[in-house]
Amino acid sequence: MSLRLASILALSLAALGLPAQQAIAQSPSVAGTWVNDHASVLVIQSVGADGSVTGTYANNAPGYKCAGVAFPLVGWMDGTRISYTVRWKNASVDCNSITSWTGYFNDGRLGVQWVVTFDEYGAPTIRTGSDSYTRR
């Protein structure tokens, strides 16, 4: 459902005195597997009616010590906007980092900016960057 159509529907429901929250929260169909230029794999398993996002992420960037391991992600969607976070730690491995991505879907692509926090040489470090994903 387009954002314009969702907005019109929400206003129509409001005029009738009906709840419009679900109509406003509609997001494009993004569930599935997405891959970026570093072959990292984002799997969006579900987008709830409230906009909550669940899935997994496997970072395959060169030199990453936890490459290929899928970690859970949590996040939110609102229309075409998305934000999600991965804590790179599970029962088997601790990569000592957290990454958050924020961006939007446009023309079948997902463009995001990311921020990662980790310790480098014993000092807290923050790095930023951007990625573009296509559906696999």
Task: Please provide the spans of the model-predicted regions.
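Central antiparallel beta-sheet cores of small beta-barrel/beta-sandwich binding domains
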Residues: Q26-W101, F105-N106, W114, Y121-R136
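Sec/Tat signal peptide C-region and signal peptidase I cleavage site
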Residues: L18-A25
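Bacterial N-terminal signal peptides that target proteins for export
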Residues: M1-I8
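Bacterial N-terminal signal peptides
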Residues: I8-G17
